[in-house]
Amino acid sequence: MGFITKAIPLALAAASVINGAEIMETRAGVQTLADKYIVVMNDGMTDKDFDSHRSWVNRTHRRRLIRRGAKAMGGMKHTYRFPTGLKGYSGHFDEQMINEISKRADVKYIERDARVQINAIEQQDNVPSWGLARVGSKEPGGTTYYYDGTAGEGSTAYVIDTGTDIQHEEFEGRATWGANFVDDMDMDCNGHGTHVSGTIGGKTFGVAKKSNVVAVKVLDCNGSGSNSGVIMGMEWATKDAQQKGADKAVANMSLGGAFSQASNDAAAAIAQGGVFLAVAAGNDNVDAADSSPASEPSICTVAASTEQDGKADFSNFGQVVDVYAPGDSITSAKPGGGSQVLSGTSMATPHVAGLGAYLIGLGKGGGPGLCDTIKQMAIDVIQNPGASTTSKLINNGSGIGFLSFPLNIYEEQWSKLFDL
């Protein structure tokens, strides 16, 4: 994910800072989308003023197309109106139109739309998963998952991803289709989103086995999408969660890209809306401060650990990381039935979202404050976590005496789970 490219003349960038919006430069290596932009409005803008601005954009864009013979562009495509926080829009504009928009005093900043992608990197067949056992134990190497029988009941997890196979037997009818902002196929044609959903709420693979799962599709069959489409999914999930009870909701984003202020602002708006959000730190073995939305400080950023409690060699790190979670060779659901093994911070993140849903089911709070609770419950075991990075690994409390009330503890043996 990235900012507006350096191809725009320096004089234009300088003028826009003086007269109105800041036009952000694109960082090296960012895969931007030609002539597509995200425009973010000033904080506190009223709906009336926002509607007035949008009308001006549409009028000006049409006038350019008709009177000036400008190159055909699609104009405004998506409008963002989060319940709290970010207001803005994205669209297809030429350089001159962006110049006009940048002069407006009511625009906060503009960035170029860019590609985002899933954060799974490896696949391995026929390997039993270990992540659940690690979440429920204070020592590595366990084969039993201990958890309270509430198991996230009453919570809802929004999986902002490639979609979810809602008919998969893992979900027992608890998964529903929410919205699609990337294509016309309401299905998971990639497999990533179903795997993530299974780790959150699957009956076999899930941390919160009784939670509800809502599929929000923002990535295509190749696991790729755009900042603008992802932000649409984030907005939809926030509004839907608020209608149903934000304090009972968690959101998972096992995706990311290069730094994007718009993506970070959208993530912050989810948190401001009262929803707990877990985000993947990324798989480039670099500081996650340069990744989005992982670098947004108000959400819960997750790095990936190995079965031996080490940092996974691919995992990003840094001060923005809140916790580690199992992310190497994780078994979960795949579309059409059965399971597959994937690795990545994408696989670590749903362990944290699932733990958030689990704690909601236990009545231990809700909203963005769950990240602090999860950090307090975490155990200090990660070896060589990376420069300026926490060594905390998540734990559900059942094995370390953190939760100070009787638990209806269940245990699951891997031999039963996987028919080994």
UniProtKB/Swiss-Prot annotation:
Protein family according to the UniProt entry: Belongs to the peptidase S8 family.
Residues listed as glycosylation sites in the UniProt record: N222, N252, N396
Protein name: Subtilisin-like protease 7
Alphabetical UniProt keywords: Glycoprotein, Hydrolase, Protease, Secreted, Serine protease, Signal, Virulence, Zymogen
GO BP annotation list: proteolysis
Compartments where located: Secreted
Propeptide feature: residues: 21-119
GO MF terms held by the record: serine-type endopeptidase activity
Pfam name, any one: Inhibitor_I9
Entry GO terms, CC: extracellular region
Source organism: Trichophyton verrucosum (strain HKI 0517)
Main location: secreted
Active site: D161, H192, S346
Described function: Secreted subtilisin-like serine protease with keratinolytic activity that contributes to pathogenicity.
EC number, UniProt record: 3.4.21.-
Residues making up the signal peptide according to the UniProt record: 1-20
Location of the Peptidase S8 domain: 129-413
Chain ranges of the Inhibitor I9 domain: 36-118
